[in-house]
Each structure stands twice: as C-alpha cells, then as structure tokens.
C-alpha cells in the first residue's frame, strides 16, 4: 500500500516553492514517503512494523499476502492508529501534525483448506497538518506564510493465498488506490493596509497496485518471509484556485512510484520467547512526477528488530522493538535523513479463544535542533482486534 507518497510530494512541492528554510520541513508531517506501507496491526507495530511474518495476525493486517494462508476459516481484523508530532525548528514559528489510519479485513476460505481469500479497506489516512513561517517584506510589512493540508487516501486490497503444505505459503494482492489531498497557502499580513493572498490546490489520485509474498519454514521454530510491492503508476487530476480567479487552472499529471521489497524472519528462541526481524528496500531515485527535485531522492532502507515474551503461557505478552530508517529523500544540502523509533506493547487473548486485542505505543525522533536546526518527536498509539472461528484457548506454537 503506497498512496501516501502523493501526500508527501504535494506538500513538499509547495514548500520548495515558497519556504525560505526547507531544512525546517516537518519530517513526520510532510515527508510521508517513509511511512506509507507501515502495518497498522498493533502486534506487528510493537514488534517493529516491518516484521511481516507474525502468525497470529493471520495476514489480515500485514503486507505479506502469504500470511493469509494460515487462516483456514472465516476471520476478521480491525485496527487503527492515531499520532501526534511535536516539531521544533530554528525557522518555523508553528508546526502541528495529526494523522490517523484505520484498516478493516475480512477473510474466508475459497477451496477446502488450500485457498483463502480476503477483502479489506485501508484508510481514511488523514494527515491534517499546518505550519507558519514569519517574515517581513522589503517595505517593512510583517506577515506569516501559512500552509495547511487535509484530506487523505484509501485503498481496497483483494488477496488470495495458497497453503502449499507444511513448509511454504504463497499469496498475491491487487489493490485499488484512490484519494483526495487538499493543500492551502495563505500569506497573512499583519498590517491594515495590505491584502492577504490565498491559493488552494486539490489533487485527485488513482492507481492500481499489485503485491506478492512467500513464507517458508525451513526448520522447526524458524520462519522466513519475502514480499514484493509493484511499481505504482498514478493518475493525478489537479485543480488550482487563487485570490485572482483569472489565474485558476486545472490539469492532469502522472506519477510513478518505485517497487519495494520486504524480508522478514521469526525465530522461537525458547519457550514463550520469540525474536522477529525485518528489512525493506526501495530505490526512490526511480521516482517520477510532481516536479520533485531528483537530486534530493535516494534509496530507502529500513531495519527492525522485535522481541515477544509470554511468561508461562500468560495471556498478556510483553513486546518491544527498535527500528532504524533511512528515508528516501535528503535535505537541500544533500544531508541524509534518518529516523529512529522504539515501540512497546501487549495484548489479551480472550478466554473464548476466538479473538484477541492488541495495543502498542511507538516513540520516534528525527534530527536535533542543536545540530540540524530541526527536530521531530512522534508518539503513535495503535490498537487492533482480530478473531477467527478456528482459534482455541491453546496458544499457537508454530514459532
């Protein structure tokens, strides 16, 4: 799932054209390229987010479609997160960010215990964001450049997975991506003898994405997964309006987003103790569209490590993880942008054995005001519920 790149590009294009200090861009609020495929499932998030081989989630809320093969009967999943960012900068007067993302999935058997299908909904991703940059004209008039963004994108993924036996599962996904993103600019003069200037840009986006995945278990207690997300070709309809209505216009654009690979592994190190690892790669130098400066694009790398422990089969597991990301764009002077985040969480297996509730809290940071003139701190809360008629109170011991 990768529609969020459209939001990032639209916002960044406006900043590059207007803001005198691009170093002060909100990494979390504007540059959403590095966050577009993160799983919403709270258990997966608590284990690093990119560890797409967590068996109890049954593939419902993950991005490796092969995990769906573990669901043999009717199953469902619902999840979401909310986040708030605190931004500090040497140039920006105000920056606020609020996002939310929800996911629904419903799975059902297609053919005996071999084929399983699911249909779902991902969105509405709603990155409400605004910032303000103060300034003074050559004639001494004070003003604030204010940028606001709202709207979001959504997708409908359809997945089919096959169980090829004890050692391998495979799956494929097609996803219909749609969305609307609105950007608004306002030059607000504080004086009484000036006229404020406004402009609005609305982007309607659409694309179709494909994905595939495989999960193997070469030895007892070990699972390895590989997932692929295809290149996305977006069609973008743009409408722009200005204070001077004679300048209003509309036009069409295209955008190409590069493919991505995700590798994951799980190892049951001891009874009740499991180690998860994951990594992803995408070459964003192949990105095309929206007049984004190609000299600021780079490769994206993500690495995550997660631990889960259940004390004597407790229904309340302890989960924690760390993640390192090299985001797929650089600052104007060529400096690479990295993000470090940590997460912790737990869950509850219902006594009926047919459902579970999970929650996670993630903390992230980019930069430092002292060394980079900007700093972003993020707190994100996840919650999810999944259930299946096939589950029992006895805990799964596949890993």
PLM region spans:
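C-terminal segment of classical bacterial N-terminal signal peptides
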Residues: 13-21
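N-terminal non-cleavable signal-anchor helices
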Residues: 6-7, 17, 216
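N-terminal, post-signal peptide beta-strand-biased segments of exported outer-membrane/organellar beta-barrel
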Residues: 20-125
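Bacterial N-terminal signal peptides that target proteins for export
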Residues: 1-9
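Outer-membrane beta-barrel porins/channels
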Residues: 22-45, 107-399
